[in-house]
Design a protein with these regions (language model features):
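A short, flexible beta-alpha/helix-coil linker loop
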Residues: 81, 130-131, 195-197, 253-255
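Active-site-adjacent mobile loop/cap segments within catalytic or ligand-binding domains
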Residues: 225-288
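Short, charged, low-complexity patches
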Residues: 105, 204-208, 212, 257-264
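Catalytic cores of processing enzymes, dominated by hydrolases/peptidases
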Residues: 141-149, 157-247, 251-252
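N-terminal catalytic or cofactor-binding beta/alpha core of small enzyme domains
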Residues: 11-157, 165-172, 265, 273-279, ...
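N-terminal Sec-pathway targeting helices
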Residues: 1-10
């Protein structure tokens, strides 16, 4: 349990970034988390915003004026992407991947869902495993899900395909940034042009790139180095399905899950600020 205390301390390392004021919301990141042996190493300086009865709880203090409205879809085309093994080892499906949703990107998506919900958003987190039976066809299967949602009349203010990036152990890419004494994994937004593959339906690349750049700027404004530069690829990545589609890489295979979760409150805040900026731009354009 002490090892879990250390892991959860990372979750709250940025909780006060929202500012202390009248409104507050709580969300528990530990639903479904595995039990940890009592022999695990103790933590230093545990975060004061964790309540240990009966489960760890993260309390985000924020002004009532920051309550947001909007809908967000989070899903994972590469559902089994996972992180560097720690003392809390998971069963690998293959190298850097696991079916266990407590340890793969689904756990990150769940944490982001709770953080955004606490900010007032309506979030749909689709945890469908799109990788089996063959990883190469995962985008075709996630596209089917998106098409079915669109056909049923669903529409969202932001579509997020949440991934984990892959780098080599010798890569010079910086793995983490320090936030309040804790190491947090870095994020990266990816957008596709759709220029390869012979597609007839193309993404709104310029609009998606604008969103990616806004989100990157909002992350950097909170903590320099928290975001890597926007990555532009020639593929489509299903970003043609609707306006405002982005792919977010949450850390890399060289990060731990703890490091990724440490940055989630910052990512949620950056997403909120990005959507606020887009709403303001729309209002200005409507006036003009």
């Amino acid at each position: 349990m002490k090892a879990l205390r250390r892991m959860m301390a990372g979750l709250v390392c940025a909780a006060l970034l929202f500012g202390r004021a009248a409104g507050e919301a709580s969300f528990d990141f530990t639903d479904g988390m595995p039990d940890v042996p009592e022999t695990a190493a103790p933590t230093e300086n545990p975060a004061p915003t964790i309540t240990l009865s009966p489960a760890f709880e993260m309390t985000v203090i924020r002004p009532a004026a920051q309550q947001h409205h909007g809908t967000i879809l989070i899903y994972h085309t590469h559902t089994w992407e996972a992180y560097r093994q720690t003392d809390e080892r998971y069963q690998e499906t293959e190298k850097w991947r696991t079916k266990d949703e407590r340890y793969n990107v689904v756990a990150v998506g769940e944490a982001l869902t709770r953080a955004l919900t606490a900010l007032g958003y309506t979030v749909v987190h689709d945890t469908t495993a799109f990788e089996p039976p063959k990883l190469a066809d995962a985008y075709a299967r996630s596209l089917t899900m998106l098409e079915q949602r669109t056909a049923s009349g669903e529409a969202y203010d932001l579509y997020i395909d949440l991934h984990r990036d892959a780098i080599s152990s010798t890569s010079t890419i910086r793995r983490t940034v320090n936030i309040g004494g804790e190491d947090a994994a870095r994020f990266m937004v990816l957008v596709g042009k759709g220029t390869t593959g012979g597609y007839r339906e193309m993404p709104d690349f310029a609009a998606n790139l604008h969103i990616a750049e806004l989100l990157t700027d909002k992350l950097e404004a909170q903590c320099e180095g928290l975001s890597r530069d926007v990555k532009v690829r020639t593929g489509r990545f299903n970003q043609h399905i609707a306006p405002r589609c982005i792919l977010i890489e949450c850390g890399t295979n060289e990060n731990t899950l703890e490091e990724v979760l440490c940055g989630i409150p910052y990512l949620a805040q950056a997403i909120a600020e990005t959507l606020d900026a887009l709403e303001a731009e729309t209002a200005i354009n409507n006036v003009e």
